[in-house]
């Protein structure tokens, strides 16, 4: 089983949209409470696709494997947790619309370093669980993966050239996105002192994203490589988000609450 999952995810790179993957693990926080880390679960569920983003092309040799999760996804996932909480979180929330800010008070005030020092085992296990949930989901939506073969999902829908797994791939992306949006909207709103959004924050992110993607194309990425264009665009956006947020933190002096 492990070999099938790992091998075929490398050969067939098309996948459900990365940011729909947390949908499958959100219920675990309600079930297990303090015994799991929501940050760890969410970032863990995204981490396997970060090999694509790091390479800026759809190639995964390690992150979609059972063993690779332990030596690749786990340390990368923990690093991403720190990048999000210590660099991205505060400026991102403060420059988001009010309906987002009002639901993010608890997240914004979380002292991640303190939480991690006390709960590093919980965070680590949550990252691993999240990563395995990603691989499990993908095993239903990739050609010739274990569950695709087991349930014969490679069969084409009658009268079309579309295999069943491809329908599951796109359908699960939409359903996952809806679940995540609904989960967010159900979060309690709190009365807060809203931060005034700085449009320059978003303009800088857009400009830097386009600049990075342009360099990537100049270095040999063909416009017709649609999948690679998409992952390169996402990677460029995340790099831009990180550096612009870091600049905002340095410019304003940061806030000790979020250290």
Q: What is the predicted role of each segment?
A:
Residues 2-259:
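N-terminal membrane-targeting hydrophobic helices
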């Amino acid at each position: 089983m492990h070999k099938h999952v790992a091998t075929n995810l490398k050969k067939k790179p098309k996948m459900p949209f990365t940011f729909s993957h947390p949908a499958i693990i959100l219920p675990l926080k309600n079930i297990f409470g303090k015994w799991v880390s929501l940050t760890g679960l969410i970032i863990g569920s995204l981490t396997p696709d970060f090999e694509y983003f790091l390479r800026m092309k759809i190639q995964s040799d390690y992150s979609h494997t059972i063993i690779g999760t332990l030596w690749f996804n786990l340390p990368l996932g923990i690093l991403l947790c720190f990048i999000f909480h210590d660099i991205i979180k505060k400026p991102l929330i403060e420059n988001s619309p009010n309906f987002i800010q009002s639901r993010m008070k608890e997240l914004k005030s979380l002292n991640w370093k303190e939480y991690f020092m006390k709960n590093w085992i919980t965070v680590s296990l949550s990252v691993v669980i999240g990563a395995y949930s990603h691989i499990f989901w993908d095993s239903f939506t990739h050609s010739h993966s274990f569950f695709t073969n087991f349930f014969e999902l490679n069969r084409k829908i009658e009268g079309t050239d579309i295999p069943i797994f491809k329908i599951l791939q796109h359908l699960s992306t939409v359903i996952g996105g809806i679940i995540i949006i609904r989960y967010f909207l159900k979060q309690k709103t709190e009365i807060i002192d809203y931060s005034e959004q700085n449009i320059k924050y978003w303009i800088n992110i857009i400009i830097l994203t386009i600049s990075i993607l342009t360099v990537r194309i100049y270095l040999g990425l063909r416009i017709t490589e649609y999948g690679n264009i998409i992952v390169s665009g996402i990677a460029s956006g995340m790099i831009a988000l990180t550096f612009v947020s870091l600049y905002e933190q340095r410019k304003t002096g940061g806030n000790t609450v979020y250290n």
